[in-house]
Amino acid sequence: MRVCVLSDSHYFTGRLNTILMKTAAEGPIDALIHLGDGYDDLRALDTPLPPVYQVAGNCDLFRSDTRNIIELSGARLLLTHGHFQHVKNGTDELLETALEENCRAALYRHTHVQKMERRQGVLLLNPGAAASGRYAVLHIGPDGAVEAELRSL
């Protein structure tokens, strides 16, 4: 399964469209994950979208869905913008939540800095800010194994 992961589009829908077109040109996108700060941006696109999973960020006013756990191809994924897990101070709290929820990956944002690390068997992935042309592609194997690539336009 191939998943495009992005966040912090901040109304730069042109960049979102470019990211999606570039990713789709490399192969089918099975799902799209948006991690907040641009919650409604995907609705502004004129292109057909794969299934979308998203959470709200600190700039998405009047939204309370700031955390979600989904299962794709047998892998449990924690989705969060990260501001309530204090990711600007590190990923320990995020990792703890992912472990408690038996997640193979925790996808987060808020810092606008791309980062990928694996700790205690959990992939911690920050795709970077889509408004700056940064995103990630997640690969989920048939056994639920999760790998990722950080990308930039």
Show where each model-derived region lies.
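Helix-adjacent hinge/juxtasegments
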Residues: 47-87
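Short amphipathic alpha-helical segments
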Residues: 17-18, 44-47, 66-67, 91-92, ...
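Active-site neighborhood of phospho(di)ester-bond hydrolases with catalytic His/Asp-centered motifs
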Residues: 5-7, 31-37, 53-58, 78-81, ...
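Active-site environment of divalent metal-dependent phosphoester hydrolases
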Residues: 10-14, 39-43, 59-64, 85-89, ...
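Mid-chain, well-packed structural core segment of small domains
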Residues: 73-108, 113
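Binuclear metal-dependent phosphoesterase catalytic core
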Residues: 18, 22, 71-73, 99-102, ...
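N-terminal active-site segment of His-dependent metallophosphoesterases
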Residues: 1-49
